[in-house]
């Protein structure tokens, strides 16, 4: 996935969920949009180097968007969770998700279920059961362990219930945890943050719902991040 043209700055603060103040290399201060409403644990500390993009849209109050955080150890995290579906869509098109590579038709944002949900991707293939794929972003990393979620997710809990219902109807149901952070090589659910999500997903997996985690890798050109891709599955610690 190609990233938009990025510029760097220093983070001053994040506030009101959707806003952040940054300090430009010139010393000027600018307010930008933050698309991530989660806790962003470890990915949004004062003084962090951040990378932001610019939009030419005339309707946006804040034309600049926070895209990435560069951590003190040099690792990168894409905090713009709107990018995750684009990342996974390209991986599905390129047959990079080996567990789903047999499907040829990809339908994004399809309404389904009894709780007024939209599945991120519905996959279809000749002679194959329909496959419902829910995408979750991995931005929380401790050591080399990627985790989800970084805050209690009632929406995520709902998605697990919906996926289990699809599985019971004879379809495939998959949670795909996509690495938006390049600092992990194994994955687990952060049960200490959302024990209910952990419980629901474990019960769903016992009944046939599938879950996979894939690592992310950034491409760098002239010291500027230019692309992000999913590389390979990592061990899922249950």
UniProtKB/Swiss-Prot annotation:
InterPro entries: SfsA, SfsA_C, SfsA_N. Gene3D superfamilies: 2.40.50.580, 3.40.1350.60. Pfam families: SfsA, SfsA_N. GO terms for molecular function: DNA binding. It comes from the Bacteria. HAMAP family: SfsA (MF_00095). PANTHER family: SUGAR FERMENTATION STIMULATION PROTEIN A (PTHR30545:SF2). Belongs to the SfsA family. This is Sugar fermentation stimulation protein homolog. The gene is sfsA.
């Amino acid at each position: 996935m190609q990233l938009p043209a990025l510029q760097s700055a220093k983070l001053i603060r994040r506030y009101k969920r959707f806003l952040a103040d940054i300090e430009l290399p010139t010393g000027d201060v600018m307010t930008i949009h933050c698309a991530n409403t989660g806790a962003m644990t470890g990915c949004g500390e004062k003084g962090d180097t951040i990378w932001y993009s610019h939009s030419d849209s005339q309707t946006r109050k804040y034309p600049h968007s926070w895209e990435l955080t560069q951590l003190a150890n040099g690792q990168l995290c894409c905090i713009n969770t709107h990018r995750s579906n684009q990342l996974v869509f390209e991986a599905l098109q390129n047959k990079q998700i080996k567990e789903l590579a047999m499907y040829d038709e990809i339908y994004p944002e399809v309404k389904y279920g009894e709780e007024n949900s939209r599945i991120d991707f519905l996959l279809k293939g000749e002679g194959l059961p329909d496959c419902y794929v829910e995408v979750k972003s991995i931005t929380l990393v401790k050591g080399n362990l990627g985790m989800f979620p970084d805050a209690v997710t009632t929406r995520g809990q709902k998605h697990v219930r919906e996926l289990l219902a699809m599985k019971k109807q004879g379809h495939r149901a998959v949670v795909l945890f996509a690495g938006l952070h390049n600092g992990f090589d194994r994955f687990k659910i952060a049960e200490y943050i959302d024990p209910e999500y952990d419980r629901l997903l474990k019960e769903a997996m016992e009944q046939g719902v599938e879950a996979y985690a894939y690592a992310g890798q950034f491409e760098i050109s002239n010291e500027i991040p230019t692309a992000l891709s999913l590389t390979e599955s990592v061990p899922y610690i249950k």
